[in-house]
Amino acid sequence: IFLRHPSGILKGLEQMMDTRELVHEVSLGGKTIDGNVQFFYALIAMACFYGCFIGFGSAIPLQANLSSLAARRTVTPTHKLKIVLSEQISAFFLGYLDVIILILYLRYILRLDFQGNMTPMLLITFLGCLIGVSLGFFVGSLGKMREGVKIGILLAVSMTCCFLSGLMNNTMKDIVEKNIPVLNRLNPAALISDAFYCINVYDDPARYYRNLIILAVMSVLLTGASFFMIRRERYDSL
């Protein structure tokens, strides 16, 4: 070969030295995997979860032992469920607007690799904000504890859930899944993060809807519990 086609030796060496990457790592759904995207999914989950402070702020005006406004509202004939829902809905839309702005910023300004359709992403954040506000309203309705104690509870719960969802360590959610999988089914932040994975990486609609259903059920339970706690509150004097 060297005697008959000496030019072929040079071409062969050039091909051997060509180090172009011919294999690309993709998910089963055919979408490129970025290991850092887990942090941003967990960040969105934290933004949804922090709606708990908006919900908490809406529950405080219904605690007659904490404010004079709440004392006046407590004695009105308005049905307690109507009061709870009106406060919670207004708090929810405020938190939801904040998260929508965050998603638009991450996707169109920072141009992060969110390959899924926007509609499923907005549905995730809808239920994510709902669970956040519901949690805050629930904690705000707990007994006659001081406001500072309730804020401490919200901080502890929200930061623990966000940590376990992978906000500080992108392998944490997988560690929990291997050792205590039920915890990932009960952690709202992990459910939100996993739902984003389902539409952007895994392409797993069944798992996506399972996460949404769990979030919806938890929101309903927390709202119902808040209503019953506010309804049964009694005061010796206002």
Each model region followed by its residue ranges:
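Hydrophobic transmembrane alpha-helices and immediately adjacent juxtamembrane helices
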Residues: 5, 75, 81, 233-237
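Regular secondary-structure segments
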Residues: 74, 101, 105-109, 193-201
